[in-house]
A protein has these predicted regions:
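Conserved PLP-enzyme active-site core in the AAT-like
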Residues: 1-78, 82, 95-99, 187-210
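Structural motif
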Residues: 12-14, 31, 110, 135-137, ...
Length: 210
């Protein structure tokens, strides 16, 4: 989400996933490596075999999705950023602590909202799931997850499993009960997700509307 990439400020290699921001929500799988030519060659040799490098390799029939995703990524990411800023301002006005706040400079698409209770975190995530294009009928529940000391709740009715550019939210059930909201393939969908999260909070008596 910034004008400069890590390679602009000294990084020799940049690696990442295409089911995140750069894939624009269209890449179903894949990753990328960018950087110094000699290091890219070494990476390619490691991936396939010395001497062959990136001259060979399966494309799996998804190159069109890769290129279209890269083309649309700036627009998709802009919508996700707009959704995060909307979430920050809306929940700030309701009295919740948000990180970053509605006016701070942003370095990614993630928006944290501290919901102050397990009930609040669960209601928020239920609202995000209810706004999903896939599995909107599913009710997310906290569960024990490897690597966490506390139960974690996740909402992600996405077309691509694990995509973080699609609408999602998650958080561990411990103080300050923060939900980490991100994504939305369009600004309108991100906005709908936040409104649905507020609806669930309202239904649980956690926020009031004057």
């Amino acid at each position: 989400v910034e004008e400069k990439e890590p390679s602009d400020v000294g990084a020799d290699l940049v690696v990442g996933s295409l089911i995140k921001n750069p894939g624009g929500g269209l890449a179903p799988i894949g990753g990328y490596v960018a950087g110094r030519k000699d290091l890219i060659e070494q990476c390619a040799y490691r991936l396939t075999s010395p001497g062959l490098g990136k001259e060979v390799g399966a494309s799996l029939g998804v190159m069109q999705s890769f290129y279209q995703g890269l083309f649309l990524a700036p627009t998709v990411v802009a919508g996700a950023l707009k959704g995060a800023i909307f979430a920050a301002n809306a929940y700030e006005k309701l009295g919740f602590k948000v990180v970053p706040d509605g006016k701070e400079e942003r370095y990614d698409i993630i928006q944290a909202v501290e919901l102050r209770s397990a009930k609040g975190l669960i209601a928020f995530c239920k609202g995000i799931q209810a706004a999903a294009p896939v599995d909107s009928f599913v009710t997310p529940e906290p569960w024990a997850m490897p690597g966490y000391d506390d139960d974690v709740i996740m909402a992600a009715g996405a077309f691509v499993q694990g995509s973080s550019i699609e609408l999602s939210a998650d958080g561990p059930l411990r103080e300050p009960y923060a939900a980490y909201f991100q994504g939305g393939l369009t600004w309108y969908h991100a906005k709908l997700g936040i409104i649905m999260s507020m609806q669930k909070m309202y239904e649980e008596g956690l926020i009031t509307v004057e």
